[in-house]
């Protein structure tokens, strides 16, 4: 199979950009969040039923993939178009060697000098087509700006509504700061009685890096053992131990 045309390369990238067979993960590449995958997953996506169906309907845009060499040619066209770039996933120790800060949630990726197209080699998507959500976001921003500029023309009931909403928002912020101060006072007072447990916390996950609802669960806890970050760290330890045992 000859190298796909530029139009075919774009069509294939659009089709496979969010394909489930890629089993994409998110990582940090050049200080930004990106999607990355293994080369063998891309080959699997090209051999999927979804791609085969497209290939039958539009063979000029989606060339048939009958061998690994065909998949290789398609992938090379994506590299030449700079839709994907080879990368190396760094471990924590390697991050420090390259002056990068290890991240608990997202692995750090480093640009590779060559693409060998090995099954377990990592590749990063640099192609990010615009989605409907992106267009809706732009439209929403424009509508919001125009609505704000036209505030003097708003009817009285809308102005009253925005006033009450702003008061409610300020009240919520005040309640949040109030809870933060109360929990700190309770913690300091509890150290004398339960210092061996690390102190008593109301809403131990209040300032943790988690969702809004999770920030208020559980209602109370002792020390850091009820914290979201501590529990997440313990889960990672158990997973790593399980992998080593396998």
From Swiss-Prot:
Membrane topology classification: Multi-pass membrane protein
Q: Name one Pfam family in it.
A: Sec62
Tagged with keyword Nuclease: no
Where mainly located? Answer: endoplasmic reticulum
User: Which GO terms of type biological process are on file?
Assistant: post-translational protein targeting to membrane, translocation
Positions in the Cytoplasmic compartment: 1-134, 190-246
- TM ranges: 135-155, 169-189
Where found, per UniProt? Endoplasmic reticulum membrane
For the keyword Amino-acid biosynthesis, the answer is: no
Positions on the Lumenal side per record topology: 156-168
* Keywords carried by this UniProt record: Endoplasmic reticulum, Membrane, Protein transport, Translocation, Transmembrane, Transmembrane helix, Transport
Q: Summarize subunit and interaction data from the UniProt record for this chain.
A: Part of a complex that contains SEC61, SEC62, SEC63, SEC66 and SEC72.
Role summary: Required for preprotein translocation.
Q: Member of which family?
A: Belongs to the SEC62 family.
Q: What is this protein called?
A: Translocation protein SEC62
